[in-house]
Amino acid sequence: MFTVENLAVRLGDKNILQNVHFTIDTPGQLVGILGVNGSGKTTLLRAVAGLLPHTGCCLMDGVPLESLSTRCLAQTVSYIPQQSGISVSMSAREVVLMGCNPRLGVLQSPTAAMCAAAEEALRTVGLADKTEQDYLTLSGGERQLCILARTFVEDAPLLLLDEPDSALDLANRSHMAALLAEFVHASGKTALICLHDPMLMLDWCDTLI
């Protein structure tokens, strides 16, 4: 169960979010966040991910996320921003394997099973032929699909996704939403998502907030 209690975010002298409350009782749900541009959807995701100072509390299975160490938070919450922030040369497979980092020790290499899972995830999103291609040379849509594949290899029970469809064409947006919904339902994870195309949320999300 995931709960947000009295969450508020203030940046400078401006209240961005105030008194946000909601509970997701059942795991395995894709929950869409509705709101006009500038209403604080990204701010909400960043606050839950621990990237913005806030008041109130976010609880995963009764445990306050605010009480977790950086490593434990990374093992509990997976945040996918609008822009990946990756600016160094890495293969698509290496980018996907970054999703395994919270489970690895210092200087520990990914296991064979992790590597196999990464390649399977790339196949699932239609990038099997891009496995060794430099991530920076992929198109914008291919980059977003690569990041979606990274999500598929992560173990975090809570997924936060901020417009993972923004660089995709209409057909690939629908395909991405279908893949994500199937993954969330099968894995039992809880996913909060903002989508560039709000109609996709009506089609694929289990509930809206």
Pin down the residues of each PLM region.
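The feature captures the beta-strand-to-loop junction immediately N-terminal to the Walker
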Residues: 34-36
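Helix-to-loop junction immediately C-terminal to a conserved catalytic motif
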Residues: 49
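Conserved ABC transporter NBD signature motif
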Residues: 56-64, 73
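Conserved ABC ATPase "signature" region
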Residues: 97, 112-130
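Conserved ABC ATPase signature
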Residues: 134-138, 142
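Catalytic Walker B motif of ABC-type/P-loop ATPase nucleotide-binding domains
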Residues: 159-163
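H-loop/switch region of ABC-family ATPase nucleotide-binding domains
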Residues: 195-196
